[in-house]
Amino acid sequence: MGGKSEPAKSESMATKPDLLNTSFFSFKSLKLKTKQQELLLRISILGLVYILAFIARLFSVLRYESMIHEFDPYFNYRTTLFLTEKGFYEFWNWFDSESWYPLGRIIGGTLYPGLMVTAALIYWTLRFLRFFVHIREVCVLTAPFFASNTTLVAYFFGKELWDTGAGLVAAVLIAICPGYISRSVAGSYDNEAVAIFALLLTFYLFVKAVNTGSLAWALASAFGYFYMVSAWGGYVFIINLVPLYVLVLLITGRYSMRLYIAYNCMYILGMLLAMQIRFVGFQHVQSGEHMGAMGVFLLMQVFYFLDWVKYQLNDTKLFQTFLRITVTSAILVGGVAVGVGTASGYISPWTGRFYSLLDPTYAKDHIPIIASVSEHQPTAWSSFMFDYHILLFLFPAGLYFCFKRLTDATIFIVMYGLTSLYFAGVMVRLILVATPAVCLISAIAVSATIKNLTSLLRTKQKVSQTGSTKGAGSSKASSKVTLDQSQPFQKNGAIALLVGVFYLLSRYAIHCTWVTAEAYSSPSIVLAARGAHGNRIIFDDYREAYYWLRQNTATDAKIMSWWDYGYQITAMGNRTVIVDNNTWNNTHIATVGRAMSSYEDDAYDIMRSLDVNYVLVVFGGVTGYSSDDINKFLWMVRIGGGVFPVIKEPDYLVNGEFRVDKGASPKMLNCLMYKLCYYRFGELTTEYGKPPGYDRARGVEIGNKDIKLEHLEEAYTTSNWIVRIYRVKPPTNRL
C-alpha cells in the first residue's frame, strides 16, 4: 500500500508548478559560497563601522550647532573660505595684513595647505553635483569623514600585518577610540583631521611595498607621504620612523631587494614631492630632522653595492677586506660631510619642539612659549587610561603575539607602537599619533585570542571509547580517555574567556561613547555648565564679544590680546590683531606679554607704539571659568621676561606662590592684566555668602578692589563677564 502511494505522490507534485525553482522565486540561485559569504560579511561590517565612525563624532552638532571648535581651526576655516572665493593662485600668494600687525604674514609660505585644499575640493565637488552647501558645513564635517576613511585604512593595514580578523577589529577599535576622537569630532577642523588618515595610509602603503617589493606600492607610499607633508608638520615622525625601521632591518640581517625598492622609491619621490610645499622647501635636505633619512638612504646604496660585490667575488677573505675598507670609508666620509654641513650652516639644527621631544625639560627651560601650550605638556597616566581604556592592557598582549610571529610587517608596527607611545608620554598631543598603533596591536591581540579560543570549541569530542584493552594498548587507551575527559573543561574555559573578552569590548564601547559625548564634544568657544537644579546653562560670551567687535569698531581697528585668541578675533571679529596662534615671532609675543605685566603707564607706551585701539582679556572670576588670562598670566611674564629682562617672575610671586588676594605682590596688584580683569569686580557679589569681589575661579577675595583706569576705558563686557574689551584712549594734549 505504501508502494502505491509514492508514485501517486510524485505524480501529483509533478503536476503542480514548483514556485521555489522558478527564476523569480529561486533561492538556490541566491545561495553564496563560503568565500562569498565571508566577503559579504566583511563588507557589511566595514560599512557599519564606517557609518559608526561618522555618527559617533556628531554629538557636538546635535548638542550645540554646526560650528568650528577650538582656536586654530578658525584660521583654517578663514583660509579655506579665502581659497574657495579667490582661487588657489590668490591663496598661494596671499599676504595677510590683518594678523601680526604691523608685520603681517605671508600665508602661502607659512602653512600646510593640505587641509584647506582637501576641504575646498570636497566643496567644489559637492557644488558640481548640485549640492549647494556652505563651506563652513564642509569644514565642520571634514574630520568625521576622514575618520571614517581611516577605519578602512586600519582594516587593510591590520589585514596586511596579521589577518582579516585583526583588520576588522582594528577598524572597530579606531572608529570609537577616544584618543582619535579627541581631534576628529565634528567641528575640529584642524590639520590632524586629515593628517592621521594620511599617516596611517603612508605606513600601510610602505609596509605593503616592503612585503611585495612592488614598485607601484612604493610609489603610492611616496604620494601618501606627500599628502601627509602637505597636511601636518607631524610628517617628521614618518621621515624618522621609516629610516629607523630600515636601519633595524639592515642590522638584523633582513636586507632584501623588496626593502631596497620600497625605501628608495618612497624616499626619492617623497622628498621631491615634499619640497614642492613652500613651508617645507629645502628643509627636507637641509634641516637636522631630515638628515637621518638621507643617511639611511646612502647606507642602503652601500649595502646594495656590497651585496653586488659579494656576488661577483668568490674569495671570502678578499670580500671581508673590501668590506672593512668600504665601511670605514663610508663612516669617515659621512662624518666629515655632517661636520662640514653643520659648521657651514648648510644643515640647520633641530628645532625647539624636536628637542623638547627628546628632552621633556628643554622647552620649559629654554622656550617657554612652547611649554605654555597645554597640549605640549607631559601626559598623565590618567590620560592614557581615559583615552585608551582596555587597549592599555591589550597592547602588551599584542606585542607578545607580534614577537611570536616576527615578520618585516610586525617589526614595523612594534617600532611604530613603542616610539609613538614614548612621544605620547612626553607630549599629550601625540597621544593622537600613537592611537592607530595601539589600536592595530590591540586588534592583533583580540583577533589571535578569539581565534585560539574558537579553535578549542571546534574540536570534535570523541563519543566512543575502547572498553577493554590488553598489553601495550592499555596505556594508549587510557591517554585517550584522559584527553577526552579534559575536552569539556577546555571548552567551558574557552566559552568563559570568550564571554570575558566580549564583555571587556562592550565596556570599551560604553566608555568610548561616554568620553566622546561628555569630554570631547564641547566646543571651547561656547561653554556649558549645569545649574543648581540640573538645568543646562550656555555661556556664549566669546561669540558675543567678537560680534560686538565686528559691529562697533572701525574696520581698521587693532586689537591686542594674548595670542590664544588671535585666530578667533580675526576670523569672527574681522579685525586686525597684534599676535595670534601662529607664534612665529617670539619677540612680538613677548612685547604683548610685557605690556600685560607692566604698570598701566608703561603698558600705554607699548600699546601706542603698536597702534593698539582695543585690548581684549578673558576673565573667569564670575563664572568660575579657570582657563582665563589670570591663570595664564605667569606664562605672559615668563615669555616677556625671556626677551625683556626688566620683567622678572619673582616680582609677581609671594614666597614662590602666585596670588591675587590681599597677600599678592604690589607688582601683581597694579599690573595691567590685573586691572583689566578686576575692574569694577570689587563691587560685584558673585556667590551667596561671599564678600563682594570674590573670585570663583580661584576661590579667593581679590586684593585690590579700588581699581582706577587712566589710559583705558571699558568699552564692552559680555553678559557673563568672560570677555572684557577696553578702548585705548588717545594721548592727551600736551603744551
From Swiss-Prot:
Pfam families given in the database record: STT3 (PF02516)
Residues the record marks as site: Important for catalytic activity: 183
This protein's record includes keyword Metal-binding: yes
Keyword Magnesium: yes
Positions occupied by motif DXD motif 2: 190-192
GO biological process: protein glycosylation
Chain spans, region Interacts with target acceptor peptide in protein substrate: 562-564
Glycosylation sites: 574, 581, 585
Molecular-function GO term, any one: metal ion binding
Documented EC number(s): 2.4.99.18
Regions of this protein lying in the Cytoplasmic compartment: 1-38, 162-163, 213-214, 252-256, 311-326, 404-409, 453-494
Motif mapping: SVSE motif: 372-375
Biological role stated in the UniProt entry: Catalytic subunit of the oligosaccharyl transferase (OST) complex that catalyzes the initial transfer of a defined glycan (Glc(3)Man(9)GlcNAc(2) in eukaryotes) from the lipid carrier dolichol-pyrophosphate to an asparagine residue within an Asn-X-Ser/Thr consensus motif in nascent polypeptide chains, the first step in protein N-glycosylation. N-glycosylation occurs cotranslationally and the complex associates with the Sec61 complex at the channel-forming translocon complex that mediates protein translocation across the endoplasmic reticulum (ER).
Family: Belongs to the STT3 family.
Chain location of the short sequence motif DXD motif 1 per the record: 70-72
Domain notes: Despite low primary sequence conservation between eukaryotic catalytic subunits and bacterial and archaeal single subunit OSTs (ssOST), structural comparison revealed several common motifs at spatially equivalent positions, like the DXD motif 1 on the external loop 1 and the DXD motif 2 on the external loop 2 involved in binding of the metal ion cofactor and the carboxamide group of the acceptor asparagine, the conserved Glu residue of the TIXE/SVSE motif on the external loop 5 involved in catalysis, as well as the WWDYG and the DK/MI motifs in the globular domain that define the binding pocket for the +2 Ser/Thr of the acceptor sequon.
Lumenal side: 60-142, 182-192, 230-234, 283-290, 348-380, 427-430, 516-735
Site note Interacts with target acceptor peptide in protein substrate, residues: 72, 375, 632
Domain of life: Eukaryota
Binding site for dolichyl diphosphooligosaccharide: 429, 567
Subunit structure: Component of the oligosaccharyltransferase (OST) complex.
Compartments where found: Endoplasmic reticulum membrane
Pathway(s) annotated for this protein in UniProt: Protein modification; protein glycosylation
GO cellular component: endoplasmic reticulum; endoplasmic reticulum membrane; nucleus
Record's bilayer topology term: Multi-pass membrane protein
Protein name listed in UniProt: Dolichyl-diphosphooligosaccharide--protein glycosyltransferase subunit STT3B
